Amino acid sequence: MFASPGPELFQFGPFVLRWYGLLIAAAVLIGLNLSSSLAQQRKLENGLISDLLPLLVLFSVIGARIYYVAFEWHNYAATPLKALAIWEGGIAIHGALIAGTLTLILFCRWRQQSFWDVLDVLVPSVALGQSIGRWGNFFNSEAFGIPTDLPWKLFIPEQNRPIIYVNQEFFHPTFLYESLWNLALFIILILLFRWGSKHLNKLPAGAMSCIYLMGYSLGRVWIEGLRIDSLCIGALPPACEGGLRIAQLMSGVMALAGSLGLWWLYGRKKPLPDPGFRPN
């Protein structure tokens, strides 16, 4: 059994340093250094990642917020300006992935880079960043699962529990499941990258990205089924009974896209269509 020490690392006057913000900043810095190193190994343009990352982070956060608010509009319709209060919580990773992808496409067209070449050096950092960032959910006592009595159960303070579970104290630490899953995915992607650097003809452009899509999505489908705060269509959390969990739907689409991409690369032995710029 374990429990969060609280969302704040320390406070100095009006300044409050929150664990979540610190973890996100750490993930961005680690991702910048790792992706820059991988880009250098793949001989991409110098400074490409450092130019790209601020745009990716900015628009991914905006996309994550818009996505969340769109599916939770019933909570914002009366006070639309609350949609801007991102510090109060409420972002969704699939919104970040959609916005990040669109940003990357436009960036690659601007800088005349192959979309898949750039994405392949980013996805290990994305997986690692997700693994790190999920610990922010731990400190905030959020994004947890259904009640459980397993040895690794997570204590949730009463004020953070849904009403129907107010008498339950211990829940599945779904943040931990996803953090470990993404860490394992990161290790697999790094090993594949190193192997692919020695066997370029066996790991074509886009293969790493497709493996990330499949790997992350399969884990998310399983973990999302345990969560009690899912965005839903046709029902309301925490149960989502009779409704559809949006994250599971999106993850299913992403897993299908990744598998089709691998089939295209290895089954048809053709390069993936590049939405960015493919040099001659």
UniProtKB/Swiss-Prot annotation:
It is an enzyme of class 2 (transferase). It holds the Pfam family LGT. The chain crosses the membrane at residues 12-32, 52-72, 86-106, 115-133, 173-193, 203-223, 246-266. GO terms for biological process: lipoprotein biosynthetic process. A 1,2-diacyl-sn-glycero-3-phospho-(1'-sn-glycerol) binds at residue 134. InterPro entries: Lgt (IPR001640). One of its GO terms (cellular component) is plasma membrane. It is a multi-pass membrane protein. Pathway: Protein modification; lipoprotein biosynthesis (diacylglyceryl transfer). Its EC number is 2.5.1.145. Keywords: Cell inner membrane, Cell membrane, Membrane, Transferase, Transmembrane, Transmembrane helix. GO terms for molecular function: phosphatidylglycerol-prolipoprotein diacylglyceryl transferase activity. It is found in: Cell inner membrane. HAMAP family: Lgt. Catalyzes the transfer of the diacylglyceryl group from phosphatidylglycerol to the sulfhydryl group of the N-terminal cysteine of a prolipoprotein, the first step in the formation of mature lipoproteins. Belongs to the Lgt family. This is Phosphatidylglycerol--prolipoprotein diacylglyceryl transferase.
